[in-house]
Amino acid sequence: MAKATTIKEALARWEEKTGQRPSEAKEIKLYAQIPPIEKMDASLSMLANCEKLSLSTNCIEKIANLNGLKNLRILSLGRNNIKNLNGLEAVGDTLEELWISYNFIEKLKGIHIMKKLKILYMSNNLVKDWAEFVKLAELPCLEDLVFVGNPLEEKHSAENNWIEEATKRVPKLKKLDGTPVIKGDEEEDN
């Protein structure tokens, strides 16, 4: 089997392709590397100006080495092998959008540190309990959530009460699974 691509190698390729220096760039795309990236290694720490980092469609198992990314606002990690949210604390004060669909996340432990997170795309993961889902209510800025394809959503959508139950537990949501959330008190006026 081919050796995994390191972040350092992927950054060197990206620099060659774009002519930009990774340490100065605001947006860096390292998605779908061949062979895939397996580790978020220490080379990420040089991305001091990066505001949007895409590492989607690789084979990353752990979120790590984000401490140097002081300006990171958007992190794209969809289609990897991530099992938990450990490692996000390093960007807890800046991250506004986390795209982490198509992974293997079952628990939302550690999400509460995301003080500025507005958008969370985490469809097609393994969250199956309300006890995990309610942790999203601890995010003061969360407005837009995509949660379709998690066992919890599938179960309640089949029972036709997903949106009602989810918005009851995370009342600040403005958009759920791509649909604007209509607040109950507005409906009562009809």
Curated annotation (Swiss-Prot):
The entry's cellular-component GO terms read: cytoplasm; microtubule; outer dynein arm
Expression tissues: Expressed in tissues carrying motile cilia such as respiratory epithelia, ependyma and testis.
Report the domain of life of the source organism.
Answer: Eukaryota
Q: In the record, which positions carry N-acetylalanine?
A: A2
Which Gene3D superfamilies does the UniProt entry name for this protein?
Ribonuclease Inhibitor
Query: Which region is the signal sequence?
Result: none
The disease tied to this protein in UniProt is: Ciliary dyskinesia, primary, 16: A disorder characterized by abnormalities of motile cilia. Respiratory infections leading to chronic inflammation and bronchiectasis are recurrent, due to defects in the respiratory cilia; reduced fertility is often observed in male patients due to abnormalities of sperm tails. Half of the patients exhibit randomization of left-right body asymmetry and situs inversus, due to dysfunction of monocilia at the embryonic node. Primary ciliary dyskinesia associated with situs inversus is referred to as Kartagener syndrome.
- Which family would the database say this protein is a member of? Belongs to the dynein light chain LC1-type family.
Q: What is this protein called?
A: Dynein axonemal light chain 1
Q: Which organism is it from?
A: Homo sapiens
